[in-house]
Amino acid sequence: PHNLGAIIRTAECAGAHGIIIPKRRSVGLTAVVGKASAGALEYMPVARVSNITAAIDTLKKAGVWVYGTAAEGDTTLYRADLKSAAAIVIGNEGEGMSRLVSERCDFKVSIPMKGSISSLNASAAAAIMLYEAVRQRSLADT
């Protein structure tokens, strides 16, 4: 619940349009999530869907590029072009994205790790990805 709340808060602060989470195998929109979001849950639309892969397909048909985060990504987030309409997929901390979700992503993006630990928690990864998109878009606007 704390990771989801932190992701909602960060997404709202970064200007994201919404968040999509699975109905099954994910935390619900509980009071703990709301508290962890520091009130952002009131402003951030959250869709709970029964089929994430179908939701990704719908986004792609609408012209949204889908970027999945993966330790072994095709490119790093610094080389990913996040300036246009983008959906960022953050996988499960323990298992990452499912095979089907990973296959639906247009790009698999890694966050460079320089230390001994090879992964970030989900909310930290989401924050880095979201604010790289903010950075790229602000540079494109100048």
Predicted feature locations:
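Post-transcriptional modification and biogenesis factors for structured RNAs
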Residues: 1-142
